[in-house]
C-alpha cells in the first residue's frame, strides 16, 4: 500500500518526521544547506517584502541550484536563469505573487513562466516558498499520484491537477488530525500541500533504499539458520519405511546367524 492511499494521519506524520534523515542520506554536496535555505530562510525573506513581495535574480539562481540539486541536473536551465536581468525577474515575481494572493494559481504560474528557463515546475517552487498551500512540482510527488492525474508531464494543466490533489490531501489530513485530537502529541503545524509533497519525497527515497536492500541476497537470520540446522522430524510415511528397512535388516541378520550355526555342527 502506498502512503497516498493510507487512512492514517499518524503514518503521514511519522513519514514527515523522517524528512531530515532521508535528505541527509543522499550525501549530495550542499543539498542539505540549499534545502535549509529554501524551506527555512527564503520564505521569511519574501514575507518581509510585503505588501509587494518579489524575488531577486540572485535568489532565483539559488532556487534553481536547489531544484536541480534535489532533482535532475539540467545545466541548460541554470544558464538561462543566469542570463535573466534583475528587473525582469523582479517584475515577473511581483506579478506572480499578486495573482497568487487573488487565488489564481494558473495566472500566478503563467506570470513566472514568461522568464526564460522557468517552466511550471520552477514556478511552483517560487510560489511554494511564499505560500505552502502551493506544492512544489517534484518528480517523486508526481509519480506518487500518476495513477490519478496521469503520467508525469511538466505542463501547466498537469501542475494545476497536481496542486488540486495535494491540497485536497492536506485538507483531509487536517480533518483527520482534528478528529483524532493528535495535536496533543506536540506537532501543532497544520498540513499543507507543500508538506504533503515533502512526505511523498521521503516515501520515494526511503522506499528506494528499502527496495535496494531487499533485492540483494540476504544472509540468513539467526532464527532461519537455527531452523535450517535443526534436524527434521520424520513424516509417518518416512517412519514406516525406516521401520520396514530395520526389520528387513534384522531378519537378514538372524538368517545369517542360523546358517552359520548350521555349518558349525559336527558331522554324524
Locate predicted features.
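Structural motif
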Residues: 48-59, 117, 182-194
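Alpha-helical interaction elements in eukaryotic regulators
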Residues: 55-59, 89-92, 104-108, 118, ...
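Short alpha-helix boundary/capping elements
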Residues: 67-72, 130-134, 204-205
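Catalytic DNA-binding helix-loop module of base-excision-repair DNA glycosylases/AP lyases
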Residues: 107-148
